[in-house]
């Protein structure tokens, strides 16, 4: 998504259309949440709390890819969207890319590692066949 159509996407995701997937551009998973808010506001004037509620109920998982110094793209983080806390969208980092010591400027070597954070919405994701 790139603009005001973001609200249409979120509303479709929130009306029982399981299995939705989209791409967006952000510097991190939390930055992507802010970008989604901004893109909704590009199309309609709406209270930020309502936008955040739409995002938090529509999106289950955020997969963040990044370009590495060797020009490859790697999955850097996998986050679960937990809900709203203190007025902000709360993310739970599940996996993070760990670079290996043998990496150099020409080849980045590493792997995703599971964090110690438990999956919070496990039952919801199991119902959808994702956990």
List the model feature ranges, each with a label:
Residues 1-86:
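Conserved P-loop NTPase nucleotide-binding/switch module
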Residues 71-131:
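NTP-binding/hydrolysis catalytic cores, primarily Walker-type P-loop NTPases
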């Amino acid at each position: 998504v790139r603009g005001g159509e973001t609200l249409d996407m979120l509303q479709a995701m929130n009306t029982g259309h399981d299995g939705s997937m989209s791409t967006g551009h952000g510097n991190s998973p939390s930055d992507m949440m802010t970008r989604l808010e901004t893109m909704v506001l590009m199309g309609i004037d709406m209270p930020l709390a309502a936008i955040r509620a739409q995002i938090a109920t529509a999106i289950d998982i955020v997969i963040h890819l990044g370009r590495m110094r060797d020009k490859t793209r790697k999955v850097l983080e996998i986050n679960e969207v937990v809900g709203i806390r203190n007025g902000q969208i709360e993310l739970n980092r599940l996996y993070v890319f760990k670079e290996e010591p043998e990496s150099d400027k020409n080849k980045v070597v590493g792997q995703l590692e599971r964090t110690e954070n438990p999956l919070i919405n496990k039952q919801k994701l199991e119902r959808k066949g994702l956990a």
